[in-house]
């Protein structure tokens, strides 16, 4: 989905100094943000006009020391048709030459009360997430104790029903059936629902239910980091499953690897409780508490003790 200036204004809560509907619908194609430096001296080699242009205290201070004619000339040269918008931080007084150049070149002029560094961070965070390439995967994404858990498995194995049970147990639904995942950076994976499926769960025999309407706003979440994958598979006698928890299976989405746990599904087995335990155990491991390692250490000590006693 294209990212527009209007979306940036709404998400980062920017004030519109000058813009039209057409200008607000202009697409932003890169998450890079430029803070003009040498450009204000008239040096425009390697200038990237397709980036958002951010003016902070330093840039504003330099502009105010220029004559009105020079200020207009520099800004006129800087504001190109490809430039999606110009943003001024700290509610700084915007020179009339900047407004004039923006109107003449057809560029949205925006303002914010927050500091330049914070504003740059907020805009970069939004643009990085919005412009990242999406990959659609089949499954149910849940927020369990603050951890994003992607539940996958064969069709009809009960992923959505498990998600519903987890919602009833106080956890939050992020996406059902189709999960759009993207890499926020090299080590961080995020997931969100397709817009048409937001807050919806499909339960065989019941149909589509609106989780937010039935269980309230606390039962849903718009997006979540994906930290653990759970794969549900039918229990088969003789098939080997990890019983100690020392398996290191991983799965890769959008270039990011996350751990995956396979859970056998069998009649009478409370899968939602098992998934809760898996999520809590994974978090404990990340905090340095590994029950498997503790057991192995105890076993080693017991074996050593028995050998000595003999």
Swiss-Prot record:
EC number(s) reported in the record: 2.7.11.-, 2.7.4.-
Gene Ontology biological process terms, A to Z: regulation of carbohydrate metabolic process
Signal sequence region: none
GO molecular function: ATP binding; magnesium ion binding; phosphorelay sensor kinase activity; protein serine/threonine kinase activity; protein serine/threonine/tyrosine kinase activity
Cofactor names: Mg(2+)
NCBIfam families: hpr-ser (TIGR00679)
Purpose of the protein: Catalyzes the ATP- as well as the pyrophosphate-dependent phosphorylation of a specific serine residue in HPr, a phosphocarrier protein of the phosphoenolpyruvate-dependent sugar phosphotransferase system (PTS). HprK/P also catalyzes the pyrophosphate-producing, inorganic phosphate-dependent dephosphorylation (phosphorolysis) of seryl-phosphorylated HPr (P-Ser-HPr).
Protein name: HPr kinase/phosphorylase
Organism whose genome encodes this protein: Streptococcus pyogenes serotype M3 (strain ATCC BAA-595 / MGAS315)
Biological classification of the source: Bacteria, Bacillati, Bacillota, Bacilli, Lactobacillales
Gene name of the encoded protein: hprK
